[in-house]
């Protein structure tokens, strides 16, 4: 197949092929990454990238938006059907942009946010001091108990003490389900709004493999990639008409200018894929594969945060190990397994070193790997960690896993 890019920029073309080779030969186990649908990539590479469309369908500031109005309207309707809600904004460029737009819509400067502590699994946009949310608003955090589960009683006490305007329930590294009903009870107790950030578990939510944030949350944000397997982007959902109007204004003109119409089209394509029966089977596989992996690691006496997992990810705990999350990340990377170092509850090391790693099952499940492969992977992870400085072992495992990976090709071509 001939590519224009090969003729116009051979350097980038060759690097894309290099990454294509890496994605095919390595085991991608970063919990926030996934392999999107080829149809999604086709939409993203379309002529829609040429069109500016500031505003919303039938309320644009530019002409020539007749077609993109239809595309965005289709994306909105599919999102509403997928998440069973009344209002959807599909313009957010990312999950962080979606969260910031929610705050911009519903809060005043220096209002109070209560979100999950970063070391317990929260996200930067849930009030971390280094984030805009930690600078523009007063941020407070709740955490987990000694068992690694969210401490709802502590969260209630903190909420009663600080009286936040908004409570955020969601995570980037928490291996258990969120109890949205309990969080709503806490929010109602203190008169707060409830934002459900389901960026990580959206694909499980829409297939009934995780509790649904509605009707408990006033507003819901998510990314469209991760477990949804759509394009990189964000969405905001609600059943409240007044909140929906504020959200729309907060996205445009509040925090963004022109929407990315090629990405919005890709979101629509992804939502259609998510509505298919095959996607339900995929979500079940994501969860069952993670259970197999957790079991394999526990049988080898590896410590997991909360003792296991109820979703698509797990956290390994190295607090009592001589090696760090960074060490494990590097060693596993050398063996062809891509994970990420991650802070964990009770963290004693810096965020650049950490005492844990986060592992996800979404990407390898998308390749069609199942219980057999995940048991093998669990055993190989254990072998590497138990002899973490053995470089020759790492290289040997890399070749073994490369052979397995080649049985489950990601794509037939790198550019769509």
UniProtKB/Swiss-Prot annotation:
Q: What is its EC number?
A: 2.1.2.1
Pathway noted in the entry: One-carbon metabolism; tetrahydrofolate interconversion; Amino-acid biosynthesis; glycine biosynthesis; glycine from L-serine: step 1/1
Q: Residues bearing N6-(pyridoxal phosphate)lysine?
A: 226
Kindly list the cofactors needed: pyridoxal 5'-phosphate
Q: What class of enzyme is it?
A: transferase
Q: Name one GO biological process term.
A: glycine biosynthetic process from serine
Question: Which residues make up the binding site for (6S)-5,6,7,8-tetrahydrofolate?
Answer: 118, 122-124, 242, 350-352
Pfam families reported for this sequence: SHMT (PF00464)
Q: What is any one of the record's Gene Ontology cellular component terms?
A: cytosol
Question: Which Gene Ontology terms cover its molecular function?
Answer: glycine hydroxymethyltransferase activity; pyridoxal phosphate binding
Q: Which InterPro entries match?
A: PyrdxlP-dep_Trfase (IPR015424), PyrdxlP-dep_Trfase_major (IPR015421), PyrdxlP-dep_Trfase_small (IPR015422), Ser_HO-MeTrfase (IPR001085), Ser_HO-MeTrfase-like (IPR049943), Ser_HO-MeTrfase_PLP_BS (IPR019798), SHMT-like_dom (IPR039429)
Q: Where is the site described as Plays an important role in substrate specificity found in this chain?
A: 225
Q: Which UniProt keywords apply?
A: Amino-acid biosynthesis, Cytoplasm, One-carbon metabolism, Pyridoxal phosphate, Transferase
Describe the reaction catalysed, as an equation. Answer: (6R)-5,10-methylene-5,6,7,8-tetrahydrofolate + glycine + H2O = (6S)-5,6,7,8-tetrahydrofolate + L-serine
Its annotated compartments are: Cytoplasm
Give the family per the record: Belongs to the SHMT family.
Subunit relationships: Homodimer.
Q: What does this protein do?
A: Catalyzes the reversible interconversion of serine and glycine with tetrahydrofolate (THF) serving as the one-carbon carrier. This reaction serves as the major source of one-carbon groups required for the biosynthesis of purines, thymidylate, methionine, and other important biomolecules. Also exhibits THF-independent aldolase activity toward beta-hydroxyamino acids, producing glycine and aldehydes, via a retro-aldol mechanism.
* Record's protein name: Serine hydroxymethyltransferase
The scientific name of the source species is Helicobacter pylori (strain G27)
Name of the gene encoding the protein in the UniProt record: glyA
């Amino acid at each position: 197949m001939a590519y224009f890019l090969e003729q116009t920029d051979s350097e980038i073309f060759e690097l894309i092929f290099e990454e294509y080779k890496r994605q095919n030969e390595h085991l991608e186990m970063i919990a926030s990454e996934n392999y999107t649908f080829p149809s999604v990539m086709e939409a993203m590479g379309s002529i829609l990238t040429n069109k500016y469309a500031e505003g919303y369908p039938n309320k644009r500031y530019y002409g020539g938006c007749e077609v993109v109005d239809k595309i965005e309207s289709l994306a909105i309707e599919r999102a509403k059907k997928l998440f069973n809600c009344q209002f959807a904004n599909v313009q957010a460029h990312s999950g962080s942009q979606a969260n910031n737009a929610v705050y911009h819509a519903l809060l005043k400067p220096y209002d109070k946010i209560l979100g999950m502590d970063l070391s317990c699994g929260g996200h930067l946009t849930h009030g971390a001091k280094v984030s805009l949310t930690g600078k523009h608003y007063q941020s407070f955090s709740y955490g987990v108990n000694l068992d690694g589960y969210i401490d709802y009683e502590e969260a209630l006490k903190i909420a009663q003490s600080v009286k936040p305007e908004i409570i955020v329930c969601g995570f980037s590294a928490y291996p258990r389900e969120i109890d949205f009903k309990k969080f709503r009870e806490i929010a109602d107790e203190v008169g707060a709004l409830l934002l459900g950030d389901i960026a990580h578990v959206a694909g499980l939510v829409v297939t009934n493999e995780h509790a649904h944030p509605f009707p408990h949350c006033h507003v819901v944000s998510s990314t469209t990639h991760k477990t949804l397997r759509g394009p990189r982007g964000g969405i905001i959902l609600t059943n409240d008409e007044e909140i929906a109007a504020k959200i729309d204004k907060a996205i445009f003109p509040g925090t963004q200018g022109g929407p990315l119409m090629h990405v919005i089209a890709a979101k629509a394509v992804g939502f259609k894929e998510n509505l298919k029966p095959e996607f339900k089977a995929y979500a079940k596989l994501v969860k069952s594969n993670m259970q197999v992996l957790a079991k394999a690691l526990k049988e080898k006496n590896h410590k997991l945060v909360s003792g296991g997992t109820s979703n698509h990810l797990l956290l390994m705990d190295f607090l009592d190990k001589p090696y760090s999350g960074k060490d494990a990340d590097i060693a596993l990377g050398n063996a062809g397994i891509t994970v990420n170092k991650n802070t964990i509850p009770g963290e004693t090391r810096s965020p650049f070193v950490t005492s844990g790693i986060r592992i996800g099952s979404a990407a390898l499940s998308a390749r069609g790997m199942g219980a057999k492969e995940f048991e093998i992977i669990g055993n190989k992870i254990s072998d590497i960690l138990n002899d973490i400085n053995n470089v020759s072992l790492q290289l040997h495992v890399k070749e073994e896993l490369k052979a397995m990976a080649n049985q489950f090709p990601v794509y037939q071509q790198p550019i769509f």
